[in-house]
């Protein structure tokens, strides 16, 4: 096994069990519900919806702090002063986490043993980069930290992600679209496809109709647009996704020739933005 330890935020939506298996250390991001701020992953993502139902407000999210990184890094280097750490960051344009890590390692004796890579992805998009890098390290245990960082950049560039919210209520409540836009969108049953482009969440084509009906069209179009490889595809979902969507996407993936399908549930951070019932796609070119 490679001696390189991977670091990522909980916003990557990698489970604790998978992180342990892949030699990945998770740094908490944060979710604020009213006057209370909690670590992402310390409570069920379903609670995000419960809070919105009670208050009409979406919880706010925040990145990992320098202290969060210092806590994890101090533990790593106290156990092994010669450790090497590759931090595969949540999109740096969407959160402070990347800069927090920079601050955390400033003037530390282990600063030269830590490399930072902005994956320019969020949620399972970031998670897919972390997983692929971890598997590459298992196949290349002799790789240097610089080689691993370069490979992670390559993997991140090849990773494509999009998701579709069930409705616009959470985007409206979070200030990401106006009341009028949300009202019209919900009345017309419109669902914007949010694609992660250069680290930013960009609204693209609007699909109309039931989520289970548009799922197959989105998969076909997203696959063709990017020429996704057929060896593996991830489907992601927030809490309370309709089971019919899973059935449709599994069948369409099989019809399109995808060899392996992995479903991953999002945590609290992306659920705050996408709301319940959302689903998405992560693939590689």
Explain the meaning of each model-derived region.
Residues 8, 89, 237:
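Short beta-strand/turn micro-motifs composed of small residues
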Residues 38, 71, 204:
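Short Asp/Glu-rich motifs
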Residues 43-78, 128-148:
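Short N-terminal secondary-structure initiator segments
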Residues 59-66, 87-94, 119-123:
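Short gly/ser-rich anion-binding loops that grip negatively charged ligand groups
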Residues 68-101:
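N-terminal glycine-rich phosphate/adenylate-binding segment common to multiple enzyme folds
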């Amino acid at each position: 096994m490679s001696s390189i330890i991977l670091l990522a935020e909980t916003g990557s939506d990698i489970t604790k069990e998978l992180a342990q298996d892949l030699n990945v250390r998770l740094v908490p991001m944060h979710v604020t519900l009213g006057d209370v701020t909690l670590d992402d992953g310390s409570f069920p993502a379903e609670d995000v919806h419960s809070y919105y139902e009670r208050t009409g407000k979406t919880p706010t999210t925040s990145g990992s702090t320098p202290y969060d990184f210092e806590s994890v890094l101090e533990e790593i280097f106290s156990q092994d002063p010669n450790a090497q750490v590759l931090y595969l960051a949540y999109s740096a344009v969407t959160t402070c986490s990347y800069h927090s890590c920079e601050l955390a390692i400033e003037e530390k004796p282990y600063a030269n043993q830590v490399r930072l890579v902005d994956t320019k992805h969020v949620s399972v998009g970031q998670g897919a980069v972390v997983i692929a890098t971890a598997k590459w390290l298992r196949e290349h245990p002799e790789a240097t930290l610089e080689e691993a960082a370069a490979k992670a950049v390559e993997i991140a560039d090849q990773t494509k992600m999009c998701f579709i919210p069930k409705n616009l209520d959470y985007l409206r409540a979070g200030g990401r679209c106006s009341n009028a836009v949300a009202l019209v969108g919900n009345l017309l049953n419109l669902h914007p496809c949010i694609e992660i482009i250069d680290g930013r969440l960009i609204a693209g084509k609007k699909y109309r109709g039931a989520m289970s009906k548009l799922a197959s069209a989105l998969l076909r179009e997203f696959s063709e647009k990017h020429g996704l490889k057929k060896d593996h595809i991830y489907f992601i979902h927030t809490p309370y996704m309709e089971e019919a969507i899973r059935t449709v996407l599994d069948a369409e993936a099989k019809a399109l020739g995808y060899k392996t399908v992995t479903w991953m549930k999002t945590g609290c951070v992306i659920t705050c933005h996408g709301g319940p019932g959302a689903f998405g796609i992560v693939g590689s070119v």
